[in-house]
Amino acid sequence: MNTRFLDACWGKPVDRTPVWLMRQAGRYLPDYMRVRSKCTFLELCKTPELAAEVSIQPVDILGVDAAILFSDILTPVEPMGMALDFVPGPVFEHPIRTMADVEKLRIPQMEQDVPYVLETIKILRRELANKVPLIGFGGAPFTLACYMVEGKGSKDWATMKRMMYAAPEVYAALMEKVTMMDMEYLNAQIKAGAQAIQIFDTWGGVLAPSDYEKYVLPYTTKLINGLNRQNVPVIHFVKGAGTMLDSVKRAGGDVMGLDWHINLGKAREVLGDMAVQGNLDPTVLFAPKDVIEQEVKRVLDENAGKPGHIFNLGHGILPTVPPENAIHMVECVHRLSQK
């Protein structure tokens, strides 16, 4: 098996920089759209054979060094008692607003409530046995709670912030419950065979650094400390965290996911020997191939050949990216970083 990705997570030397892409199983791939045209997004997530098929596609098509489970961060929230739909973005019919709402939430029994996720992981481990490692994932407690409180996506997350400031006891009760659910969910993925875990805190960066420290860090730290992570590295990705990397580091992950708003070399100065993942601007993949190569080289140069670097985009790959540009990016990473 290609172990470059796992070796880099642990800061071990590798013969070339490993690369994978957030949202690498997605709409930019015609093969994905062929599968997706036959079912809804939720049906795809809940059908293990199909979810496994689209998870493997980028490994075969792009030549990436890791596969990531195809699912959605809100998958385990639905069985807490929250009806979920995608129209096209995620929408919860009854958002969390009061302590009574929080008290109604249940902690799912993962093997009974999300068996399709665990079965997808088992299929993928069999299918990927001689290829690449499998990354499991979940949303960070704060990002999950944002959707649960707002009921849908938001530009400013004002309802969530209002709860945080004006009803701190409701906020704390919700975050405790979501953290416990998240811990159960990610541990179930590890038990099923996930070889690494990525925690996505997509909205952690919308807070002031002091608010992140007070309202988010304790829960993410509790989550990471509660994972059964012997030999399973944890990647912690907080979008927009460039000004508070020292705080995010204290949550205790093994790898820091970086978006494209920070120089990778500067991030290294704050993070020390911690492994890093990133951080090409996703829109670079719309550029001509020579520009893509220049930008890949820039990111690699910022890392300055230090061990513990996984190449990735700074956020998910965009749906209209030409697949051949993503293939070219992967090829450039491998060629330019070859020892």
Swiss-Prot record:
HAMAP family attached to this UniProt entry: URO_D (MF_00218)
Biological role: Catalyzes the decarboxylation of four acetate groups of uroporphyrinogen-III to yield coproporphyrinogen-III.
Record InterPro entries: UROD/MetE-like_sf, Uroporphyrinogen_deCO2ase_HemE, Uroporphyrinogen_deCOase
Coiled coil: none
Location of this chain's protein in the cell: Cytoplasm
GO biological process, one term: protoporphyrinogen IX biosynthetic process
GO cellular component terms, A-Z: cytoplasm
PROSITE patterns in the cross-refs: UROD_1 (PS00906), UROD_2 (PS00907)
Alphabetical list of Pfam families matching this protein: URO-D (PF01208)
Keyword Cytoplasm: yes
Protein name in the entry: Uroporphyrinogen decarboxylase
